[in-house]
């Protein structure tokens, strides 16, 4: 849907055609750019207007130019991280960094560079991405998406050619090189398969036919119970999460919608968000956060609708158990007929050694895989092997989904876009609009595993895995066990839109990486297949706290953006509400005020009793007792099973409030408290120290206090910090709150939006935007969005540049 030209379009066109009239300031020291009054001498170009905190507002005439400006601006902030990712998708990490070094995990789960390279070199050798680019839309990317990719590559390359790198992470590095549109698309592909082939890179690249007698006769089916536990852990330990809630007009002060998006993503590496506004006058005007290397806004808003995403519970892969020809382990049988596996031989250059050549083995179902994570081996024997199906290996449609969101005029258009493109691989969508509508949908690309198919075709291993984890293991020797197709699906072998869980216009729609079941606790969603996620299962502590919070907000009503802001930084620890008072009470009656630690020594915990009693149950930087409770809770949950921890077990009839009531007689409670007290004292940390004194990130020579708490603590404002007792506590954040947005409408022409990029725009320590928003996050402050032209033009630090392919 296109935007009607109006006053905004007239102003924007004027900027493009007469940019000399705009104010400009001196360039950043690492950019040599054109004055707005001196446009480039031809080729692609864009106008970039920087407002506070280094947020670029990119203005272009068409999608190729928009991609150009986006690629340029991303490179200016994140060139080293981007270049590192392009080394990954080109399969060149071993060449530049050594085969045994560890990648950052942002584009696959490979444990070392060599398997990462073997996988991505295989993708390149077979022209996988090029074939997807050649598919006509909607199965393949649209012309607009391809123009964005082409422009992005040109913009990135132009920045490299016209600027010097000041980031010490890659200054002068030979691995920082120009890219192509295929490289940009390959990064999109890597993100798409992150939950499928990307999760199994080590198992794909290690797969070899059995050579020894022992290997040929080994039992091919892992122990069912241990396999089921490993499968659950595989998906439980993902490093990405999120919260998001949409409120309908029935709950708000003005009858319009509200949206709070709070994705929890890595603070370092290639899955960081980067903030911008993208504008083509009369065509597109969207602002928000994009994953690095992306050509489009991933989570954001336009003038009428706002959306966010959460990592979904849908299982984006399945396995096919192959019955092999006894005479040849590289031949498998389907309905009794032999089919040869396809060899994919790739060579990887390795620093300090000869090139490494390996062969991967592929079937009609996908690659042969010998493990899913470290805990789920899938041995290849003379009789059995396993092939992995990942439908997102045929999905390069995410940019078109994002473009559709950017053009949407309401939640109905968001849903239409999802149905038309089916481009989201592993995320839910939560949205609200100015008309007062709310939306939750788990519209993602999933293998078409119906419960009936799993029941009819699961192998022994599949019968163990599917009910508990949603991973189907189908009998690959039977043609009638192939994945079918829905008539409304964009590609074969996946569910069509009609089968996706959808909740429209509920008072609130919320997700915290739980299943679709309780997007609204008063309107549960049921009837979907197990592969989408569980129904009637316990919620995480974070999800329980989130449901309680947003349902109370909806019941209160009269909500505004300020209420969203308050929710984001309430920092309530749900686990503290559940057990802190009971722990303090039982602590106070311990004989002699002592407890026995895990080392068998008595520890005086009497001071801890009062600290826990006085704690406000929050993870705010000024909270006293938060750190003590955090260290206690970590130790307690590490050694005590949920069945022993609670007196009142989980009930599907009351999922938000159960389980509850701490079993203080559990043997681990007093021990965990003693160990936490000993740990803090040994580190020289007072039991009643403020959280902000010992939960920090270090940026330059500055320690910045960090609010929030862990998944286990059940804090909406999630952070997963790194403990270093010798450095005084938590000194870095691995994952957590990232691009946050609170969006509403007040009847005016501009949305009411507040945003925050917790780790800031740039990873370059020499940038003024290396930690400026991190300091805001520390203080619970926000950035007021400058979406409309009048707001951009009135920015006190406005800096305008025109960038082009030629100087």
Give each language-model segment a name.
Residues 59-83, 274, 363-378, 384:
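Short, surface-exposed, low-complexity cationic segments
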Residues 1-29:
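Secretory targeting and sorting signals
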Residues 56, 60, 65-116, 308-355, ...:
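Gly/Pro-rich active-site capping loops and adjacent beta-alpha segments
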Residues 286, 317, 424-553, 633-638:
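Hydrophobic alpha-helical segments
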Residues 280-292, 296, 300-305, 309-471, ...:
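Glycine- and hydrophobic-rich flexible loops that cap the catalytic core of alpha/beta enzyme folds
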Residues 626-708:
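Charged, long alpha-helical assembly modules
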Residues 34-258, 263-269, 280-283, 287-290, ...:
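Substrate-recognition/specificity elements adjacent to catalytic centers across diverse enzyme folds
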Residues 520-598, 690, 694-807:
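Terminal end segments
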